[in-house]
Amino acid sequence: MGERKVISKYYPPDFDPSKVAKIKVKRPTFTKVTTMLPMSIRCNTCGEYIGRGTKFNAKKETVQNEDYLGIKIYRFFLRCKKCAAELTIKTDPKNSEYVCESGATRNYEPWKETDEEKSNRMTKEQEEEQDAMIALENRTLESKREMEMLDALEEIKSLNSRNSEIDTEQLLEYNLQKQELEEKLQDEEDDLLVKSIFNNKNKLELNQINDNNSINNNIDSNKIKRIENDDDDGDKFNSLFSNNNKNNKNIINNNNNNNNNINTTSISNTIETTPTTNQKTSILGNKVKVVINKQEEPIPKNNNNSEPNSFSSFMSAYSDDEED
């Protein structure tokens, strides 16, 4: 187990640790930091302007063999965000600011006065206080410089006016007229849009009214057709009903005639028979036949008066036979 885990190692007796070669570990000379630009700069490679306060992942190192009153000076390596060119800036503890070292130039800041400019201004003021002639000369030089600057500005304006065919006042008037025309056109477009919207709304309302009227007309026409069809069906039913009534009346009349004929035959048979036993059976047979015929054929209600006459005649004939 000990050999497998290599817990204990064997050192020979002639081992000299001083002779063992030391492994050089490469350590990073830079430290990565996230910084913000303390000033606005311009890239010399692509001309991109980088504003103050832009964040960068920079590499920081200490400048060798360079310090100010024992204060270390640091160098920062940056990358341009557009062309990825390397930019370097250094700390300046003497003036309490930063300096562009390579890859970029610092933008001009008129509110910031360097120490050299400040020292020159102080010496100039002291000289003017000591000697009035020097002060007078300096004032004349400053006035002369101002006059030269004004002349240069006037020349530039005259050149621009010659090159330009349109006067500034005319240009302003043209811009005002153009703006008024655009506003007028916009107002007209808005009015047309509003009118079109309202016209479409009115058209839709009219179409809806027409559709409703057409639907109502269709419904009324369908109702009229149904009523006419119902009237036709009623006429047909009435005609059929009247025909059925006529047929029923004819059938009833035929039945009445048949019953009357049967009754007359039964009565004639009873009168013609003689008082013998054989004739009784024949009379009974005829009577049975008459009764059967009455059950098979329905008797109408209108002939109730004829039925008791036939039955009474039948019973009287039967009683006469029994007495005999």
Swiss-Prot record:
Keyword Nucleus among UniProt keywords: yes
The keyword S-adenosyl-L-methionine is assigned to this record: no
Subcellular location per the Swiss-Prot or TrEMBL entry: Nucleus
Pfam families reported in the protein's UniProt record: Saf4_Yju2 (PF04502)
Low complexity: compositionally biased ranges: 302-316
Single GO biological process annotation from the record: RNA splicing
MF terms (GO), sorted A to Z: metal ion binding
Segments for region (Disordered): 294-324
InterPro entries registered for this protein in UniProt: Saf4/Yju2 (IPR007590), Yju2 (IPR043701)
Keywords associated with the record: Metal-binding, mRNA processing, mRNA splicing, Nucleus, Spliceosome, Zinc
Amino acids binding Zn(2+): 43, 46, 80, 83
GO cellular component: U2-type catalytic step 1 spliceosome
Subunit architecture: Component of the spliceosome. Present in the activated B complex, the catalytically activated B* complex which catalyzes the branching, the catalytic step 1 C complex catalyzing the exon ligation, and the postcatalytic P complex containing the ligated exons (mRNA) and the excised lariat intron.
Similarity comment: Belongs to the CWC16 family. YJU2 subfamily.
Function: Part of the spliceosome which catalyzes two sequential transesterification reactions, first the excision of the non-coding intron from pre-mRNA and then the ligation of the coding exons to form the mature mRNA. Plays a role in stabilizing the structure of the spliceosome catalytic core and docking of the branch helix into the active site, producing 5'-exon and lariat intron-3'-intermediates.
Name of the protein described by the UniProt record: Splicing factor YJU2
